[in-house]
Amino acid sequence: MSATPVPCQSSNCIKDRPPSRLECPTCNKLGIKGSFFCCQECFKANWKTHKIIHDIATPRQPLLDDPNINKDGTFNPFGTFKFTGPLRPVYPLSPKREVPAHIPRPDYAEDGIPTSENRKLGLPPRILAPEEIEKMRNVCKLAREVLDIAAAAIRPGITTDQIDAIVHEETIKRDAYPSPLNYRHYPKSVCTSINEVICHGIPDQRKLQEGDIINIDVTLYKDGYHGDLNETYPVGRVDEDSQRLMRTAHKCLHEAIKLCKPGALFRDLGKTIEPIARQNGCSVVRTYCGHGINDLFHTAPNVPHYAKNKAVGTMKAGMTFTIEPMINLGHWDLEHWPDDWTSTTIDGKRSAQFEETLL
């Protein structure tokens, strides 16, 4: 039991995420903070996905005669899960990377709970002051530097965990904090999404292969502000469908950016993005949206990328938000892996994404 109530951590809470003191006992033993539920029913309903946190926090030491273990010691932790495509996770995950004590960090860095975000749910988009805008420009510039360095390392044979290490080290070289690290208990410093993974892929021991495509999603936190961007890259030579997919996703983003100005409606971005995707035989993911970003990692406004959405609000000078359309070769719907982060296409076909932070 916790002395200070926090919102229920269930994503589909039956009581609309009220404050709660009921803590997962296993998380408590492992030192994982912030795993609270409003009632036993919510805890039981989320057990199948929640328990994955325990596996991540406690790297498995498999038996040598375990048939599910590869000769190099790697393994698929979700062997009974019905994957939608050919990609598989390759565990164990490396230990959590350390951030030097002198680097300021967001409020969720220790316990995984973005308290400031939770407090400001439902509030309108914030207009930044000139000095805040300069901090946003600086952190976005640094995030671009880190992304470009990580992208230069892409080659067949490198693991996504090695890419995570590059992003982490380059981030702390800039006296910044890697925003994804421990955000809602995400275990790594960057998201690496390969082939059919739409977003939030967790870096692991899988080696990139010739013909893969990979999205690297970098966010830095510095001077109290977050800068967020991502791009999708080919690994060596890729097939024509993958090239078409990446071209389409890139065009969707940049045609939407052209619409951005004070007075433009957020809901109109999808009217430009979705026709481009359809004309190229692709679909637009509806589950995830762009978002406001400033001193909070995710905040208002929501920025849908599909047509006929019901997003509210107009763009105003001083707002900062992301546009990040996720484009699929097949159906727009998705499936989550049991790690509760990795989102893949429902049909196993490939997905690509490009993202920028807009001012």
What spans do the regions from the language model cover?
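Active-site neighborhoods and metal-handling regions in enzymes and metal-associated proteins
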Residues: 2-5, 12-20, 31-35, 47, ...
